[in-house]
């Protein structure tokens, strides 16, 4: 997800690739779990894809991007798979005979800086559980931004733009792709509503509903948005 960037170079990405190949063994098809841009821009040939649920991890827009969706002067944000909760996404199956070649391409895209902690996670699908490669992020990583106040998030959505486009476009693409796959991520929807209310995108249906409700009664409190534990990865 990030291009080579000395600010984020934390380890040689060849080492986790060798470890993952040893775990996979090359004796079967390879599954990959998509939770953000891999859903709407996978860039590899998949023999099959399925909706999937991962427990123990959640999607969060908390990974710093200084190249693809931002700059060193104005870092952007991209989604990461963080510990805790649960996550709905899509698993893709690479055919064994092509998986090694496709894995090289995927690694060049996702792991040029070695910032992720790639691992196999059990993914529940309608046809059973499959072990799938997922790109996770540690809270100890220098790329981890933590939970940002809405004011800071809005500033990033307004101004962060990198070689592949803006953080705002990236978030919108992910939200729309999730909806197309029947996934409603409450935190993603909350951020989309926030962007809509501040005029950054066309107003979302949820944002319009919230706006109407707030004009009807000011005495009824609206429950706060929950964490992303009910959704996807």
Task: Please annotate each region the language model reported.
Residues 1-233:
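A glycine-rich, hydrophobic/aromatic-adjacent loop/helix-cap motif
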């Amino acid at each position: 997800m990030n291009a080579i960037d000395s600010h984020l170079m934390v380890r040689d990405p060849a080492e986790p690739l060798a470890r993952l190949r040893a775990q996979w063994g090359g004796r079967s098809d390879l599954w990959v779990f998509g939770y953000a841009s891999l859903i709407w821009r996978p860039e590899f040939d998949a023999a099959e894809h399925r909706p999937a649920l991962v427990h123990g991890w959640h999607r969060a827009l908390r990974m710093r991007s200084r190249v693809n969706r931002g700059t060193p002067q104005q870092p952007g944000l991209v989604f990461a798979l963080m510990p805790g909760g649960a996550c709905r996404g899509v698993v893709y199956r690479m055919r064994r005979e092509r998986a090694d070649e496709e894995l090289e391409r995927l690694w060049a895209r996702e792991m040029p800086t070695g910032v992720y902690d790639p691992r196999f996670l059990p993914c529940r699908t309608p046809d059973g559980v499959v072990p799938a490669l997922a790109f996770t992020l540690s809270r100890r990583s220098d790329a981890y931004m933590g939970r940002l106040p809405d004011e800071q998030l809005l500033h990033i959505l307004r101004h962060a733009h990198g070689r592949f486009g803006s953080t705002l476009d990236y978030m919108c693409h992910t939200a729309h792709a999730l909806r197309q796959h029947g996934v409603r991520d409450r935190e993603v929807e909350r951020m989309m509503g926030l962007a809509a209310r501040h005029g950054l995108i066309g107003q979302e249906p949820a944002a319009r509903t919230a706006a109407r409700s707030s004009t009807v009664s000011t005495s009824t409190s609206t429950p706060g948005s929950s964490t992303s534990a009910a959704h996807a990865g």
